């Protein structure tokens, strides 16, 4: 990925081979670029909880995120609750985290910051 392009502006690329799984050094480099996200599932996923005033806003966010996931062809695991949504990105085909997960995490954070 070109370092001049922010994660939120980048687009997902096919990443189906084990060599696309990010190592610890690259994870440490990218994690500060997605504030609020943390490594989960023993370092195999990125997770963040988003909080909302009510269930309607939670579902509006989840539906908007579904559209982004569809456009990027990279889909998170989500759990939806009253006033919060937990979003978890992982590249299942490689058994860990790829740059696609960071791209989608950044896009998800940008969506949240827009007040959706």
Swiss-Prot record:
It catalyses: (4aS,6R)-4a-hydroxy-L-erythro-5,6,7,8-tetrahydrobiopterin = (6R)-L-erythro-6,7-dihydrobiopterin + H2O. GO terms for molecular function: 4-alpha-hydroxytetrahydrobiopterin dehydratase activity. One of its GO terms (biological process) is tetrahydrobiopterin biosynthetic process. SUPFAM superfamilies: PCD-like (SSF55248). It is an enzyme of class 4 (lyase). The keyword Transferase does not apply. InterPro entries: PCD_sf, Pterin_deHydtase. Its EC number is 4.2.1.96. CDD domains: PCD_DCoH_subfamily_a. Keywords: Lyase. Belongs to the pterin-4-alpha-carbinolamine dehydratase family. PANTHER family: PTERIN-4-ALPHA-CARBINOLAMINE DEHYDRATASE (PTHR12599:SF0). This is Putative pterin-4-alpha-carbinolamine dehydratase. It comes from Xylella fastidiosa (strain 9a5c). The lineage of its organism: Bacteria, Pseudomonadati, Pseudomonadota, Gammaproteobacteria, Lysobacterales.
């Amino acid at each position: 990925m070109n370092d001049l392009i922010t994660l939120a502006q980048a687009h997902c690329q096919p990443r189906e081979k084990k060599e696309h799984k990010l190592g610890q050094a690259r994870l440490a480099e990218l994690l500060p670029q997605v504030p609020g996200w943390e490594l989960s599932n023993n370092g195999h996923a990125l997770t963040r909880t988003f909080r909302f005033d009510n269930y309607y806003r939670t579902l509006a966010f989840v539906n908007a995120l579904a559209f982004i996931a569809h456009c990027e062809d990279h889909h998170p695991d989500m759990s939806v609750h009253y006033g919060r949504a937990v979003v978890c990105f992982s590249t299942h085909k490689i058994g860990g985290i790829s740059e696609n997960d960071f791209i989608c995490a950044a896009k998800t954070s940008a969506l949240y910051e827009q007040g959706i």
